[in-house]
Swiss-Prot record:
InterPro entries: dUTPase, dUTPase-like, dUTPase-like_sf, dUTPase_trimeric. It is an enzyme of class 3 (hydrolase). One of its GO terms (biological process) is dUMP biosynthetic process. Substrate binds at R70, S71, G72, N83, L87, I88, D89, M97. It comes from Buchnera aphidicola subsp. Acyrthosiphon pisum (strain APS) (Acyrthosiphon pisum symbiotic bacterium). Its cofactor is Mg(2+). This is Deoxyuridine 5'-triphosphate nucleotidohydrolase. Coiled coil: none annotated. Signal peptide: none annotated.
């Protein structure tokens, strides 16, 4: 297991808000909370940046963090991430910000302390490129989008 350093940037995190945490024993992602003074309106079809009040430092170049939407917010309310996935590099040390996008037709309200996203840590493979003139031929070759059809017999 790797240790990830965390820094509290906003004093409200010490008093009222909890640090990222797993909701259940089987959770893969740690919930990230909105560090706000007051409720913020996210208008329909608009985006907003929500501060978390924390910074992390991964330090290990073989680990990255991904900020992902919470499934319930996306499915039930239409609230997803404005950048779809937030990629946190191992050398980033700034505040974690959540870009929320309201893809619904209804305004949505983000309250202080709301769980608005989740963060997971994943291993990274950092390959070296080998320059070649040609690849070894495969049965797929250059076939791309839709090449296997819709029903795709296995």
């Amino acid at each position: 297991m790797s240790n990830i350093e965390i820094k509290i940037l906003d004093s409200r995190m010490k008093n009222n808000f909890s640090l990222p945490s797993y909701a259940t024993l089987g959770s893969s992602g740690l919930d990230l909370r909105a560090c706000l003074d007051e409720t913020v309106k996210l208008k329909a079809h608009k985006t907003i940046l929500i501060p978390t009040g924390i910074a992390i430092y991964i330090a290990n170049p073989n680990i990255t963090a991904l900020i992902l939407p919470r499934s319930g917010l996306g499915h039930k309310k239409g609230i997803v991430l404005g950048n779809l996935v937030g990629l946190i590099d191992s050398d980033y040390q700034g505040q974690l910000m959540i870009s929320l996008w309201n893809r619904s037709d209804q305004d949505f309200y983000v309250n202080p302390h709301d769980r608005v996203a989740q963060i997971i840590f994943v291993p990274i493979i950092r390959p070296c490129f080998l320059l070649v003139k040609n690849f070894n031929e495969t049965s797929r070759s250059k076939k791309g989008f839709g090449h296997s059809g819709v029903s795709g017999v296995i």
